[in-house]
Amino acid sequence: MISLRHTALGLALSLAFTGQALAVTTIPFWHSMEGELGKEVDSLAQRFNQANPDYKIVPVYKGNYEQNLSAGIAAFRTGNAPAILQVYEVGTATMMASKAIKPVYEVFKDAGINFDESQFVPTVAGYYTDAKSGHLLSQPFNSSTPVLYYNKDAFKKAGLDPEQLPKTWQELADYTAKLRAAGMKCGYASGWQGWIQLENFSAWNGLPFASKNNGFDGTDAVLEFNKPEQVKHIALLEEMNKKGDFSYVGRKDESTEKFYNGDCAMTTASSGSLANIRQYAKFNYGVGMMPYDADIKGAPQNAIIGGASLWVMQGKDKETYTGVAKFLDFLAKPENAAEWHQKTGYLPITTAAYELTREQGYYDKNPGADIATRQMLNKPPLPFTKGLRLGNMPQIRTIVDEELESVWTGKKTPQQALDTAVDRGNQLLRRFEKASKS
């Protein structure tokens, strides 16, 4: 009898523990962070899981931003969407117009978590805020601005002051010629050419990218990046390209690897590229602001963000949404947001994270680490330098890439390429406008 009782008790305990294990709510989180950035995402998830044993955040790398967005939407249509989907900033209008999301402010409200939306830096939060309700639709996560990375050792070899980086595009052209003359195979390369050379070039120099305040004021916006200032800028890059001073190495972040491998002396890339540069560069490097056009009065203005936010997908149960809310709240805590900023180079997305980082002396110990924030806050944004909210923007970026490539290969002039990009892009905007009204 005693043996049977012990067996029954053991079985009951076993079932109880099994039940507890099964009670863990698994929360898939699809993202596009690879390399050192992916390791930081995994670290955040592990720390949350340890502190919240009832939930398990499962980060899954699903490819680059475009691939992740496509995979997420496709999965939603088949009923297999993740709970959390990281979407890059130009996918915002697409996500807003979809029926695939549950706004984050509703997620927090339903979970009974008092979440202060005002904690986010306004210029970041504004990108993901619903104009009608004034609430966040997605949560800012890895926001960035383009910055200029430069090889201080290469500068010294070329007889350039390693503490004096080029401030204007005209100066950058002069620097690249000297760097090439000193033996560098590549004087300058750029990542994310559409985002940096047109979207941010326009904002940084106080120019609209599209009408209707870059789409924030309506879906009937038209593209306007084929004006004389933008054409002149692309023409300058093309002249550098012909001389071999500017190297086109790819549409995404390929220039970062070319930089930290020592092939290119300078690159404009995401501030979020700092994590990989810090890990792999074997030389002294510096970080500076994006160049501006010396001939444009009032420049520089302010940078607009890139990177991505976290969207919550529809169709999940209450317990999953509660876990999602707790995880998003965890990410926004000052100590976690500050650590993410410091380890990756992405912007501090909350005011508290910025203040904590400053109080810790991080900016004093790491000169240049605050460049991305300073660019974003350089001047109060104009109505058309707050960012972009244009439908089908991922596809428009692809068009821009194709047309700029036609310039670098000598098939089109800068004016022809930008005119064509605007015409093709406007066709996509009209399709989005029509679909959004149906």
From Swiss-Prot:
First and last residue of the signal peptide: 1-23
Cellular-component GO terms for this entry: outer membrane-bounded periplasmic space
GO biological process, alphabetically ordered: transmembrane transport
Keywords, ordered alphabetically: Periplasm, Signal, Transport
Residue ranges that the Swiss-Prot or TrEMBL entry lists as coiled coil: none
Residues that bind sn-glycerol 3-phosphate: Y65, E89, S144, S270, G307, Y346, R397
InterPro entries registered for this protein in UniProt: Bact_solute-bd_prot1 (IPR050490), SBP (IPR006059), SBP_1_CS (IPR006061)
Localization terms from the record: Periplasm
Pfam families hit by this protein: SBP_bac_8
Function recorded in the entry: Part of the ABC transporter complex UgpBAEC involved in sn-glycerol-3-phosphate (G3P) import. Binds G3P.
Subunit structure of this chain's protein: The complex is composed of two ATP-binding proteins (UgpC), two transmembrane proteins (UgpA and UgpE) and a solute-binding protein (UgpB).
Family: Belongs to the bacterial solute-binding protein 1 family.
Protein name, UniProt field: sn-glycerol-3-phosphate-binding periplasmic protein UgpB
Native organism: Salmonella choleraesuis (strain SC-B67)
